[in-house]
């Protein structure tokens, strides 16, 4: 089992704890990570794009002139894509972009992402985050004490009211619960702050 330093919110060393190899120490398969991230990003798309084709554009039910004898090109409707004000040919229509990924693969990718962060020393294991107020300054002091300046993802077991309010004005910080975090989020942020409770949740639920 890999040993990892547990610190408090001031950055002081508390102890070394054993992390489960099956969660935080597995080998990385980039193809699995790519497939899951690709699916998660695709599911973010609304897919509500739409244009009006010749059937949806208002009007055009009557033939503009008779078929023969006028010397003009033959037309059956003024809403043909060839006409000004006509429908769009082969335009986008609403669709569902979601891609099915098996639950086993999603869980595997989540474990790989955590292992990746552990291997690259981009994960900070903290005992707990306690804030007396909801002021941004108080949480910024914690980031300064931990010497964190890059994009940061905070993973907790449950949402904390003061913590939620204190990070709202920090553009580079995101708070997420372990039950809702995605592989895309784990890989998008440079630093992960993981509480001890959140780590225990992963070990209990990702096996």
From Swiss-Prot:
Chain positions covered by the region annotation Disordered: 55-76
In the UniProt record, does the keyword RNA-binding occur?
yes
Q: Which InterPro entries match?
A: Ribosomal_uL4, Ribosomal_uL4-like, Ribosomal_uL4_dom_sf
MF terms in GO: rRNA binding; structural constituent of ribosome
Q: Report which superkingdom the organism of origin falls in.
A: Bacteria
Task: Write out the GO cellular component annotations.
Answer: ribonucleoprotein complex; ribosome
State a single Pfam family of this protein.
Ribosomal_L4
**One GO biological process from the UniProt record?**
translation
Q: What Gene3D superfamilies does this protein's entry cite?
A: 3.40.1370.10
Specify residue ranges for compositional bias: Basic residues: 63-76
Q: Which UniProt keywords apply?
A: Ribonucleoprotein, Ribosomal protein, RNA-binding, rRNA-binding
What NCBIfam families does its record include? rplD_bact (TIGR03953)
Its job: One of the primary rRNA binding proteins, this protein initially binds near the 5'-end of the 23S rRNA. It is important during the early stages of 50S assembly. It makes multiple contacts with different domains of the 23S rRNA in the assembled 50S subunit and ribosome.
Assembly and partners are described as: Part of the 50S ribosomal subunit.
Protein family membership: Belongs to the universal ribosomal protein uL4 family.
**Name of the molecule in the record:** Large ribosomal subunit protein uL4
Q: Which organism is it from?
A: Phytoplasma mali (strain AT)
Which gene is the coding source of this polypeptide chain? rplD
């Amino acid at each position: 089992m890999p040993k990892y330093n547990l610190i408090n919110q001031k950055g002081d060393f508390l102890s070394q704890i054993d992390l489960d190899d099956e969660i935080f120490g597995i080998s990385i398969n980039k193809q699995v990570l790519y497939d899951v991230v690709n699916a998660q990003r695709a599911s973010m798309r609304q897919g509500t794009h739409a244009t009006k084709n010749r059937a949806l554009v208002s009007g055009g039910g009557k033939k503009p002139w008779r078929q023969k004898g006028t010397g003009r090109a033959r037309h059956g409707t003024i809403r043909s894509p060839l006409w000004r004000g006509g429908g769009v040919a082969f335009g986008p229509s609403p669709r569902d972009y979601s891609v099915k990924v098996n639950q086993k693969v999603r869980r595997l990718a989540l474990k790989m992402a955590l292992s990746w962060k552990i291997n690259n020393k981009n994960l900070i294991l903290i005992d707990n985050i306690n804030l007396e107020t909801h002021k941004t300054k108080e949480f910024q002091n914690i980031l300064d004490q931990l010497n964190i300046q890059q994009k940061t993802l905070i993973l907790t077991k449950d949402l904390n009211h003061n913590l939620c309010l204190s990070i709202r004005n920090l553009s580079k910080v995101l708070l997420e619960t372990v039950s809702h975090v995605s592989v895309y989020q784990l890989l998008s942020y440079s630093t992960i702050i993981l509480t001890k409770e959140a780590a225990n949740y992963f070990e209990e639920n990702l096996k």
